[in-house]
């Protein structure tokens, strides 16, 4: 039995790749280059069944916010993406509806963005204390000299069908 265990340990030790290819850990350069973008956002929000609320006259709302993005350059076509966003909706109806988002995702070819994360808001139209939600987003960012112009589509599902959809644009610097 001892010989079998020793033989297995020897095979395991010899099979460990000591000089492995480092492509999975950042390629030839292991430097992590982070880029930061930030900017204003404005656009349209649709909150399903929001007109059932006493606070809102319509489910269609204007959105205004500020967003920060950090990308880790992947030395190729794929970058890692972190997004933080604060948005206020309902100003067109004299209502203040703030929300915050934190997402993680990918940026493809420095333009197409796909992300998922958490959404927090201070208002729950179902009155069941559902203040945290999943948020998914897809967007396109176009270079504009020293600025860039993003266009994002956001979906926030809800267990009680009070989902939200948003389309935003803005400017990054």
Per-region residue spans from a language model:
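Membrane-embedded beta-strand positions in outer-membrane beta-barrel channels/transporters
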Residues: 65-67, 101, 135-137, 166-168
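Short glycine/proline- and aromatic-enriched beta-strand/turn motifs that initiate or cap beta-hairpins
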Residues: 20-65, 170-172
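Repeated loop/turn-to-beta-strand initiation elements of outer-membrane beta-barrel proteins
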Residues: 75-80, 110-114, 143-152
């Amino acid at each position: 039995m001892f010989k079998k265990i020793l033989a297995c340990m020897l095979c395991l030790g010899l099979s460990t790749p000591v000089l492995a290819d480092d492509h999975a850990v950042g390629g030839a350069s292991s430097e992590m280059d982070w880029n930061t973008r930030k900017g204003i956002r404005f656009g349209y929000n649709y909150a399903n069944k929001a007109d059932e609320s006493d606070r809102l006259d319509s489910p269609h709302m204007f959105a205004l916010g500020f967003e920060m993005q950090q990308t880790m350059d992947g030395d190729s076509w794929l970058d890692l993406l972190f997004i933080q966003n604060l948005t206020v909706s309902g100003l067109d109806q004299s209502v203040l509806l703030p929300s915050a988002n934190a997402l993680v995702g990918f940026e493809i070819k420095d333009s197409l963005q796909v992300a998922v994360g958490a959404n927090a808001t201070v208002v729950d139209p179902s009155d069941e204390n559902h203040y945290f939600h999943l948020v998914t987003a897809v967007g396109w960012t176009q270079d504009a000299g020293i600025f860039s112009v993003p266009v994002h589509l956001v979906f926030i599902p809800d267990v009680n069908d009070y989902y939200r959809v948003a389309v935003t644009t803005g400017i990054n610097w």
